[in-house]
Amino acid sequence: LPSTSINPPAEIGEETAAVWGWGGANIRARNFDSARYNSGFDYMIWGDYYVDNKTGNRNSSGVGLVGSPGFMVTVGKTYWEGANSDIRVGTFIHELGHNLNLKHGGTDDFNGKPQYYSVMNYNYQLTGIPKADGTRYFGYLQQDMPTLNEWALNERDGFGPQAGEYLYTHKDKNGKDVTQPANQPIDFNRNGVIDNSPVSVDLNGDGILNELTALSDLKKLNFDMTPAQAGAGGPVAQPEAEENPVTADDARNLGLIP
């Protein structure tokens, strides 16, 4: 889908045009029975790339509506030449998750939470979730994980016993990557030792110390994707859209594409 074929439809509002600028609504209208769309069926597009009218971004990996049918995966050869099946599968499940009412932190939109082992987490979208048995999991978090209080982290506990099947990669005091079982002690503050007292670390890199929760995605999933209808005498509520900021440049920096 080159950008010239997916211009924004004129009949939609300004807010929606900014996020549906790829023309998905028009493509769906031409190729998908409206009765199915209005009765809970989903609709997705495998695209090469799209141009966001608001930012001009061309190499986003996709876009999805939150709690409403409609998403697109755009990891095509123009910007994502060499993208493997892991990238395609992870991005597909990520964008579908938005339709199923999931956000980047599951129940919230705090991204990058290390113990949130879900492809909704940008950390795991392109690569899958590393498991202790050497495999990678492409899916949603299926159990509650311990809450991490960034201002008082217990290094001895790691991510707790629930994280025993997962791996965690972090930097050591010399800046080298260390991969270890996530339920073992973790040197969060990178001082070379496991501290006995709580430490304060911004684990998800958002610049603030926060309480990072990671509840099971199964508690948040909503399979009723029927589009919102207009209220009495009111306009149709516009769906919230999530343009994916993970780009081909990010994949290239990770060594995932040439």
Pin down the residues of each PLM region.
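Active-site-proximal segment of zinc-dependent metalloprotease catalytic domains
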Residues: L1-Y117, N121-L126, H170-P185, S197-S200, ...
